[in-house]
Amino acid sequence: MTEFDINTQVRLDETLLVEDDPIICLRLQRLLARMHSAPVRTTTADSLQAARGILETDDFGLVLVDIGLPDGSGIDLIGWLQHQRPALPCVVVSSWGHEQIVLEALKAGAIGYLLKERDDEELGAALQSIQRGGAPIDPAGAR
């Protein structure tokens, strides 16, 4: 298994969104689509179980994961990914910005942590940073 290399450019054109709020999914799908001139493929999963099932059969360039999911914490999925697919980058997009949760997500293997409360311009800039190999962490969660 190859670990994720932070110096590698991340592909956002094939993204798995692990999010149980359909409005947030649509928002992120639109942001990702606006960033590319070519079509993008975004697949959504509304639970940990659904995400694991998709990840066992499909390839992605990036996983965007929420922390609060109906069947557990997105941090569990990040840890699972580190064992199953360590080269696949995972970024948290959550409304939970508590320092302890941010640290747990990063320790589990997330390469970035973004807050949903940011406007589309800020989230778009953070996603572009990820695409170029950056590892953005929202300042509100990095206190």
PLM features: what roles do these ranges have?
Residues 19:
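Conserved acidic carboxylate
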Residues 53, 75-87:
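Short amphipathic alpha-helix used as the core "switch/output" element in two-component signaling
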Residues 22-43:
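Two-component/phosphorelay signaling modules centered on CheY-like receiver
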